[in-house]
Amino acid sequence: MGKIVALGEVVSDIYRGEKPSEVELPFVARPGGAPANVAVAAARLGSEAAFIGSVGEDLFGNFILRALEIEGVDTSAVRRCDPPTRTSLAFVEITGDGDRSFTFYRSDPAADELLSPEDVSRDTLRGATFVNFGSIPLIKDPARSAIHRAAELAGELEVPVAFDVNFREHLWESVEAAQEVVEPLIERSRIVKLSDDEISPLLGTEDAAEAARMLLDRGVSLVFVSLGPEGAFYATEEFEGDVPSYPVQIVDATGAGDAFLAAALVYLSEDEWDEETIREAARRGTAAGALACTEYGAMGALPTEDELERFTNGG
């Protein structure tokens, strides 16, 4: 099943609890953050998984680390930050259709922003099938330099980079600033995954095939575009196609894209990248993404290998 190494942000997602009153508003904390979600999703699917990141020496940092360790994720490369630096909190609001919005509460700097190049070691990346990261750590240093260090080491070790863009426009000074920082990492990536709402601001098109062609022209080998309820699109230099979604009752879409990517990467760890294999990777990705939407929290409904097999086979 290979080894997936994910690095970047990890946060505590905060959801409203049950039975609020006029004088009490209960909340439930759940671990989150795209790279951490990918690591957990990969581990549940039977892959070896490691996470490189930074959390506070606080209640939420302890909670997140314990959750990752219970899932079988190697956390030996996670930095702990002393106060006043804290683990970031993301308050999640869920709409009626399962979509969500986030309000972040962070110290300045936040623990996840202090991931540094020194935290990214050759030993952690050695033997990996894929190295995965997104764009949020690229917003500022030292986390930005840590991502570049990971990409550099991955190149030296011949480990493919899987870049899940995960673009959050409100976190950047401008779209242009994001494009300038993201571009060099795209050029170092073998796989790039985006959602359909990210291709327009970053690539200037709303067409998935056109966006994929632009990325392939920059040296990317494989592009995935997740299309929400429409499924997913995939493309290489030789072929392209799409797979349908799996209908489910959506409770919370948080982590669906991370589940998609993890399932695809785990499957691609085992086989040559011919058209049949890539199509199956996309199909399994859409299935994992659908299952991830059926419970609250980014990690709550991430499927095991057996659960994914039963679901895709109609069981």
Residue spans for each PLM region:
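Conserved beta-alpha-beta core of the PfkB/ribokinase-like small-molecule kinase fold
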Residues: 133-213, 230-231
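Short beta-strand scaffold segments in enzyme catalytic cores
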Residues: 40, 89-93, 231-234
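Glycine-rich phosphate/adenosyl-contacting loop at the front of the ribokinase-like
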Residues: 1-74, 95
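Conserved phosphate-binding/catalytic region of the ribokinase-like
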Residues: 1-5, 152-153, 204-315
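Conserved N-terminal subdomain of the carbohydrate kinase-like
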Residues: 48-133, 310-315
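Active-site metal-binding loops of divalent metal-dependent hydrolases
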Residues: 10, 165, 259
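General beta-strand structural signal in soluble alpha/beta enzymes
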Residues: 6-7, 77, 161-163, 193-194, ...
